[in-house]
């Protein structure tokens, strides 16, 4: 039985992500031995000559044959057999097995396309020979040499995969802390599986790069005499015009692999900017196959993530500074990290399945963990990101998060030290920088454009309605609205007093609702739960002081509660407040009357005032129907055309910080 000592790992990310890259090692096996330096005594020991010894009866496959791709497929078949064995023994659950097996099967299917290319070009080399990759750090031209380099990288990834499966089959039993063997084995197995998922991600990216650099459909795979790069395809064409200018510094269309040190110098020269503080973050993001090189494929993916090359660096720095990017995390690991988090937590990661896409995993208002894909926009020169349905384009990932910040509130943030901001600003920058308040009109226009954004295809779509009974009087002309809102001086004084209290509370409050640009994702429920919790006392005071005109004052006395509701809402288990029995309007509005912050939602009211919807006209133009609500005052008084022109509410003269489009029921 193998024995190993388990020690705690201070980093959230597995240690193998920060090991020296291939081009900086003296032999291939160093990278494999450092995958789990917390389990250094586990089976495999490396010496200075690069030889490998094991203490188990099962050994890692080594290759010294001419048909290297066929041998890679042999390794893959053994891995597939092991995965099925682990699934049958419930070592891997269904999700973990599916994630790992899909990548391995995809790798096998892809490699089959290159057997003919290898045979026709008589490519003969030993994959286990470390001199192929690590003899020197140099620029690699497009052709046979770059193909061999790519195959060697896949070999390394598969060997890492095999090594972790070996460790998973024989977890250690010697421990250094007081716990049971079963719990220790479970802990160790989970750690190994997480590392497997990391290698799985790198393997998928390596095979994606091979397919991009040497597409199976190109003539380069069918030309018998293609010993050079004289073929109809060149990965140089993956680059935009601006990116080609950058790549020309390294040799133009003849070059495929550029060492990181050379690329980074050219990258700084292109932007005419010293960015040493961001080098580790850039290297983590650009060199996602962990081989120490940058290719046209990697640069093109970077542009898909962060926009056209001239603006990509600025967007990338903003993302790093905002501490929202978690990097290359699998969907399974993201779900695990969010499993005990509250509503509003999210994790921003790079998609493994869609090249150049972002994936956002978040906890929705029903405490379910959901996943969202943001696809790169390739049809636009400036790039951007888009949801699949409908295809609204966001300028950057930050624009998307700010647009839906009522749902994406608390980022998990970097899980690797390389993704942290520079030390000079790491403690000074907020989690997310809000847009300038002076750009109010621009934000309003953005809200109008994003009015019908749908999010996840797995969730039913819905739309917003507003409580018509609460808004019926405030939607009227200024004269009628003021007459109904202030029937006597006592009510007016009480309202001014409530406003004063609200302003004092707003100064002291540090709340995530300050990040909201849009009210919610359009497919979520119970959006106003948090707002109702913060405003319970205000609702109660308002109802007691204004029993005769409850509907008129509902919107105007809450801090940020616009009474925006969805079409399907249910009352939660929190206790409901006192209904105003003095109202003659059959008001069914439930108010919170507890002091322990139990939340409840409010059902939609029916407009029984006898007011006609045709009278709810914009207070500015008096032509269009009211369809916007002002924040922070909560008044509904303008149409969408007039609201973008205003800086102060025409009802209460309060400053307008945001405008939200609504739909009446």
From Swiss-Prot:
- Which keywords fit this entry according to its UniProt record? Calcium, Coiled coil, Cytoplasm, Metal-binding, Nucleus, Transferase, Ubl conjugation, Ubl conjugation pathway, Zinc, Zinc-finger
Q: What is this protein called?
A: E3 ubiquitin-protein ligase cblA
Please tell me which top-level EC class this enzyme sits in: transferase
Q: Where is the Cbl-PTB domain?
A: 109-400
Known role = Acts as an E3 ubiquitin-protein ligase, which accepts ubiquitin from specific E2 ubiquitin-conjugating enzymes, and then transfers it to substrates promoting their degradation by the proteasome. Up-regulates STATc tyrosine phosphorylation via an inhibitory effect on ptpC accumulation. Recognizes activated receptor tyrosine kinases, RTKs and terminates signaling.
Binding locations of Ca(2+) = 287, 289, 291, 293
User: Positions of the region EF-hand-like?
Assistant: 232-306
Renumbered zinc finger spans (RING-type)? 618-653
PANTHER family on file: LIM ZINC-BINDING DOMAIN-CONTAINING PROTEIN, LIM ZINC-BINDING DOMAIN-CONTAINING PROTEIN-RELATED
- Pfam families named in the record: Cbl_N2 (PF02761), SH2 (PF00017), zf-C3HC4_3 (PF13920)
Free-text comment on this protein's domains from its UniProt entry: The RING-type zinc finger domain mediates binding to an E2 ubiquitin-conjugating enzyme. The N-terminus is composed of the phosphotyrosine binding (PTB) domain, a short linker region and the RING-type zinc finger. The PTB domain, which is also called TKB (tyrosine kinase binding) domain, is composed of three different subdomains: a four-helix bundle (4H), a calcium-binding EF hand and a divergent SH2 domain.
Q: What is a GO molecular function of this protein?
A: phosphotyrosine residue binding
Q: Which gene encodes it?
A: cblA-1
Q: Quote the PTM field.
A: Ubiquitinated.
Q: In which pathway does it act?
A: Protein modification; protein ubiquitination
Species of the source? Dictyostelium discoideum (Social amoeba)
Q: Which GO terms describe its biological process?
A: intracellular signal transduction; protein ubiquitination; sorocarp development
């Amino acid at each position: 039985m193998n024995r190993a000592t388990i020690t705690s790992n201070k980093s959230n990310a597995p240690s193998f992500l920060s090991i020296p890259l291939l081009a900086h090692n003296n032999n291939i096996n160093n990278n494999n031995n450092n995958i789990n330096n917390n389990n250094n005594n586990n089976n495999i020991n490396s010496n200075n000559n690069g030889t490998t010894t094991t203490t188990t009866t099962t050994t890692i496959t080594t290759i010294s044959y001419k048909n290297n791709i066929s041998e890679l497929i042999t390794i893959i078949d053994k891995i597939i057999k092991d995965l099925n064995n682990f699934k049958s023994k419930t070592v891997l659950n269904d999700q973990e097995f599916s994630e790992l097996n899909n990548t391995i099967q995809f790798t096998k299917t892809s490699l089959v396309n290159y057997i003919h290319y290898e045979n026709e070009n008589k490519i003969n080399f030993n994959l286990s020979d470390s001199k192929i990759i690590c003899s020197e750090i140099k620029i690699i031209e497009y052709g046979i040499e770059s193909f061999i380099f790519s195959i060697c990288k896949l070999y390394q990834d598969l060997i890492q995969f095999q090594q972790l499966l070996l460790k998973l089959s024989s977890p250690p039993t010697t421990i250094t802390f007081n716990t049971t063997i079963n719990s220790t084995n479970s802990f160790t197995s989970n750690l190994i599986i997480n590392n497997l998922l990391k290698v799985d991600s790198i393997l998928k990216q390596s095979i994606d790069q091979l397919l991009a650099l040497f597409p199976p459909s190109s003539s380069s795979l069918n030309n018998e005499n293609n010993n050079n790069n004289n073929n109809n395809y060149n990965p140089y064409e993956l680059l935009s015009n601006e990116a080609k200018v950058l790549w020309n510094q390294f040799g133009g269309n003849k070059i495929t692999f550029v060492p990181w040190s050379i690329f980074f110098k050219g990258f700084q020269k292109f932007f005419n900017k010293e960015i040493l503080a961001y080098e580790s973050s850039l290297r983590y993001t650009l060199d996602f196959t962990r081989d120490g090189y940058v290719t046209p494929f990697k640069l093109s993916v970077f542009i898909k993530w962060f926009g056209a090359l001239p603006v990509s660096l600025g967007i990338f720095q903003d993302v790093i500074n905002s501490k929202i990017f978690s990097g290359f995390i699998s969907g399974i690991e993201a779900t695990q990290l969010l499993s005990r988090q509250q509503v509003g937590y999210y994790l921003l990661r790079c998609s493994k399945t869609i090249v150049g896409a972002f994936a956002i995993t978040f906890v929705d208002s029903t405490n379910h963990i959901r996943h969202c894909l943001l696809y790169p926009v390739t049809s636009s020169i400036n790039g951007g990101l888009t949801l699949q349905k409908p295809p609204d384009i966001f300028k950057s990932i930050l624009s998307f998060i700010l647009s839906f910040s009522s749902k994406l509130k608390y980022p998990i943030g970097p899980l690797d030290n390389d993704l942290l901001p520079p030390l000079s600003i790491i403690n000074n920058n907020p989690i997310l920088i809000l847009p300038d308040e002076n750009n109010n009109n621009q934000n309003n226009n953005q809200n109008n454009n994003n009015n019908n954004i749908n999010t996840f295809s797995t969730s039913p779509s819905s739309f917003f309605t507003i409580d018509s009974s609460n808004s019926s009087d405030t939607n009227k002309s200024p004269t009628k609205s003021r007459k109904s809102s202030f029937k006597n001086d006592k009510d007016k004084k009480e309202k001014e007093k409530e406003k004063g209290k609200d302003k004092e509370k707003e100064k002291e409050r540090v709340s995530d609702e300050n990040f909201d640009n849009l009210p919610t994702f359009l497919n979520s429920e119970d959006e106003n739960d948090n707002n109702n919790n913060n405003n319970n006392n205000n609702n109660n005071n308002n109802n007691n002081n204004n029993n005769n005109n409850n509907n008129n004052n509902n919107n105007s006395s809450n801090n940020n509660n616009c009474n925006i509701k969805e079409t399907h809402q249910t009352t939660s288990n929190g206790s409901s407040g006192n209904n105003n029995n003095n109202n003659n309007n059959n008001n069914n509005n439930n108010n919170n009357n507890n002091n322990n912050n139990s939340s409840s939602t409010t059902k939609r009211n029916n407009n029984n005032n006898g007011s006609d919807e045709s009278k709810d006209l914009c207070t500015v133009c008096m032509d269009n129907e009211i369809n916007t609500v002002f924040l922070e005052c909560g008044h509904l008084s303008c149409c969408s055309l007039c609201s973008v022109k205003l800086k102060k509410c025409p009802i209460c003269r309060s400053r307008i910080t945001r405008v939200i489009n609504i739909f009446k029921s």
